[in-house]
Structures are given as C-alpha cells and as structure tokens.
C-alpha cells in the first residue's frame, strides 16, 4: 500500500484491448470468449500487483469494458478523450489511450500540439498525434 503522502503512477500497454466479437486490424483477429477472459484476468492481476494510484493505458479499443474492469478493481474514475476508429461494422483500426484513477478526475481534455514546439522541431501545422494524449486534472484529497 502506498504511503499517505505520495501518489504513484504507471503506464500499461493493453495490446489490442478489444472485447469480442469485434476484430482488431483484420477480420481474423477476434478473441474467443476464453481468450478474452484470460486477458481480463491477466490484466486484473497485473493491476493488483502494480498497486498504483493512477494508470495511463495504451491500445484501448473497448473503453467501456476497461472502465467496468477498472471500477471493479478500485479505480472508479476513468477517462478517454477520443473514440476508437471502426473501419467496417466490427473491424477496429485505431485504438485510443486513457487514464484510470483511484482519485477524482476533475477535468480531462485532449492534448493539442503546441505551435512553438512544432516550429522548433521543424514540424508543420498539420501535425497530429497518432493517438490523442490525455491531459487530466486529478484531485488528491490526502495531499
């Protein structure tokens, strides 16, 4: 358990987190019920082992499913700032990132590219993130 005067953060790449019967990137990529349950159980065990306060997630195709799982694991606050792209009925081709917290997420918004930084790195104004980052303000009642 964390000390009362600290907050811990982690990141977690979920590797194609998509609830069946949907497919990721190709119509052949669909988890069976058993595979999905194993993935959910493995993620839950990993989250328990991390025992952190705030988690940033990558490769989310099923945000609602992840939000439910995180709530069950003691993270009642969850946010994404974008929607996964669905190519054709149930074929998902572009996941999103998200954040889960044990503490209230007061504000969440997409991170926008900064024009000065774009210029400094010789990037044009058409630059966009492959997956829109999340900027979140979290209330920490114990600090």
Range-by-range predicted roles:
Residues 1-77, 82-95:
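N-terminal, active-site-proximal structural segment of metallo-dependent hydrolase catalytic domains
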Residues 60-143:
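Structured beta-strand-rich core segments of catalytic domains in phosphoester-bond hydrolases
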